[in-house]
Curated annotation (Swiss-Prot):
Positions marked as site (Transition state stabilizer): H182, R243
Reaction catalysed by this enzyme: acetate + ATP = acetyl phosphate + ADP
Cofactor info, note text: Mg(2+). Can also accept Mn(2+).
Assembly information from the UniProt record: Homodimer.
Localization per Swiss-Prot or TrEMBL: Cytoplasm
GO BP terms, alphabetized: acetate metabolic process; acetyl-CoA biosynthetic process
GO CC, alphabetical: cytosol
Region forming the signal peptide: none
Positions bound to substrate: R91
Protein's name according to its UniProt entry: Acetate kinase
Keywords carried by this UniProt record: ATP-binding, Cytoplasm, Kinase, Magnesium, Metal-binding, Nucleotide-binding, Transferase
Gene Ontology terms, MF aspect: acetate kinase activity; ATP binding; magnesium ion binding
Record-annotated active site: D150
């Protein structure tokens, strides 16, 4: 076992994903998730080597209690691992315009994360809890906490893509612009894709699709991101599990002025009650759509809307890549596993030079990676993401 391990924390609005990784060998010694935080059924699931465990937390446990459980009830029982943790890597969804690369967390970085809360209102507050609790639990590592920003990969986006067509004053005064998200994942799979395609990353033109409960698409020109579908917040873009993605802004005025729905309620509707959940009124889980779209008209409608929006982004982004597209990449829980969705989507892209290989498309899921199109097609690849490994590799640099 290496003497230098990294504890990776991804604190979400109601969950904490955690892992202990050796950045050099890429081995994951511990991984798990505390979920349903602040609810009655809060629990922790984790894996050590090949052994799986699960435990209930106290009812309505918050992030602080969950982190204490992770350290006291999991890591403390693996002291050979605990004593070799030399740094803590934190995934940060939005670092604003000032945080352009991974960095040690100090007061200045903490202020930037706080100032960016309006742009990631569900995520950044949770990240701060994770950081401050890490300071308390690991006082010996207080100067070894590293922020790895989802927005950093998107800092290469030019202003003709990140500016909105609203008065320029709002950007200059309040930094209202496109920030994007999932940058850690987009960066990882773009490099993996360039290796598979045997093209240097600095010459790779790709469209990467991170498709999970949240989802985003990025256009990558010569290895650099030049546009992405998420915007000021993670609400913009494609259809997601509970988020609406792109809509006519006038819907907000109609709901508020005509239907007398408060701004707070509208925010909740767009963030937590829309997307696949809103379209089906049953589930935000894409597995329901995959399993039922051939026999259920509601699921079929949701699938078609999802693929229509996604295909529009892919088609539009191809025009930004200077007449050369090396491939598109699917990642995230949906992108890696939803073979029916991938087939429907790629069939929509036939006009652009894509041709699905049904056998490969069916086989390449459940953690497998590879090309799912025919040899005469522009490649479409499935690549499982590994954000935790990226965070660990970025963090070890500062230890």
């Amino acid at each position: 076992m290496s003497q230098n391990l990294i504890l990776v924390l991804n604190c979400g609005s109601s969950s904490i994903k955690f892992s202990v990784i050796d950045p050099k060998t890429e081995k994951k010694y511990i991984s798990g998730i505390a979920e349903c935080l602040k609810l009655k059924e809060s629990s922790v699931k984790w894996k050590i080597d090949k052994s799986y465990h699960e435990s209930s937390l106290n009812e309505y446990s918050d992030h602080n209690l969950a982190l204490r459980f992770i350290v006291n009830e999991i890591l403390q029982h693996k002291k050979d691992i605990l004593k070799k943790i030399v740094g803590i890597g934190h995934r940060i969804v939005n670092g604003g315009i000032k945080c352009t690369k991974s960095t040690i967390i100090d007061e200045k970085i903490l202020k930037n994360i706080k100032d960016s809360i309006p742009f990631a209102p569900l995520h950044n507050p949770a990240h701060l809890i994770g950081i401050y609790e890490s300071f308390k639990i690991f006082p010996n590592l207080i100067n070894k906490n590293v922020a790895v920003f989802d927005t950093a990969f998107h800092q290469t986006i030019p202003e003709d893509s990140y500016l909105y067509a609203i008065p320029y004053y709002f950007y200059k005064k309040y930094n209202i612009r496109r920030y994007g998200a999932h940058g850690i994942s987009h960066s990882y799979v773009s490099k993996k894709a360039s290796n598979i395609l045997n093209i240097p990353i600095e010459k790779s033109n790709l469209i990467t699709c991170h498709l999970g409960n949240g989802g985003s698409v990025s256009a990558i020109l010569n290895g650099k991101c030049i546009d992405t579908s998420m915007g000021l917040t993670p609400l913009e873009g494609i259809v997601m599990g509970t988020r609406c993605g792109d809509i006519d802004p006038s819907i907000i005025f109609y709901l508020h002025e005509k239907l007398k729905i408060s701004v707070k309620e509208i925010r909740e509707i767009f963030s937590e009650k829309s997307g696949l959940l809103g379209l089906t009124n049953i589930s935000s889980d894409f597995r329901y759509i995959e399993d039922n779209f051939l026999k259920n008209k509601i699921a079929k409608r949701a699938m078609k809307i999802y693929c229509n929006r996604l295909s529009k982004y892919i088609g539009a982004y191809i025009t930004l890549l200077e007449n050369k597209l090396d491939g598109i990449v699917f990642t995230g829980g949906i992108g890696e596993n939803a073979y029916n969705m991938r087939e429907l989507l790629i069939n929509k892209l036939k006009i652009l030079g894509f041709e699905i290989n049904k056998e490969k498309n069916f086989k390449i899921r459940l953690g497998r990676s590879g090309i799912i199109t025919n040899s005469n097609s522009i490649p479409a690849l499935v690549i499982p993401t590994n954000e935790e490994l990226v965070i660990a590799k970025e963090s070890i640099i500062f230890t």
